[in-house]
Amino acid sequence: FFLLAIAAPSVVSCTGSAIGVGALSGLAAYEERSIKTIARDTKIAILLHSALLNKSKKHFMQIGIEVFEGRVLLTGGVESAQMRADAVGTAWKVENVTAVLNEMAIGLNSLVDTARDAFITAQLTSKITLDKEIMAINYSIETVAGTVYLIGIAQNTVELEKVIAHARTLSYVRKIISHVRIKEIE
């Protein structure tokens, strides 16, 4: 767990992973995942980033990684089908991975597209965070080439529909793909 405390802030593309360990326990009251699951997801992200970096710096720089409940969402543009297959294979080799959601496209994004995508993600994150009817902490967002990818846990279908509605209001959003699951009623 000490390794996670040191390494978690260095994982830039994993929104949930960038939270420090101290903040982790405070946020756990709002987060649908347990602290153990958050730590496991963080570890998966760190190990996958490391494996991709060791394999190729291109892999590391071009592939976005989000991990939620052991489900790994891979996004970004890669140069070839082989590069995409290698990334998926690498993800499956990481311990505790339960699913790999391959949303990588063949073809690289321009610097303008990358900046625009980051802006879309920031805008959507802000909108859902400020919406009192959405538990934003339970969502991770990636945007690639104008496509918004969502992963996480919605409290109900109404909440998920609100998140998607917020995404639809943003300029340059071409498509929204949801890998969000609806919370099970206990």
Q: What are these language model-derived features?
A:
Residues 1-16:
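Sec-dependent bacterial lipoprotein signal peptides
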Residues 12-186:
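N-terminal targeting leaders
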